[in-house]
Amino acid sequence: MSHTPAPASPEAGPEPARSTSEGHLTVGDVVALVEAAAPPGLAASWDSNGLICGDPAEPVRSILLAVDPVTAVVEEAIDAGVDMVITHHPLYLRGTDHVAATDPKGRTVHRLIRAGIALLNAHTSLDAAHGGVADALAERVGL
């Protein structure tokens, strides 16, 4: 897991990133940057990618990166005071009809929302993206 400050003015994608009055990117800006690098159209039909919870208008000052959106990651995000968590694997792989706090995934969503933390995941879209996970692994093993 990695805790990194969000860039103030990234140079990615065809449109310049917007920012809040304090100069921070917004949740929506970060989503757009991730989707520019890993377009949702590249995702497998069975996969779930995108913004799981969070207000696109909220500022993002810091981001926690992780592989899975598990309880330990949520606790680390809350303790670190980050505004957003980006994971590779999705919280919900299939559609859901509830987010009650009576099950682990529902509790995760509730904890994130109460803490004001957005959750974004990019799974197979990032795997398939040019320069993404598959390309990086292929390069590493010499393919």
Model-based region annotation:
Residues 1-143:
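Hydrophobic structural segments
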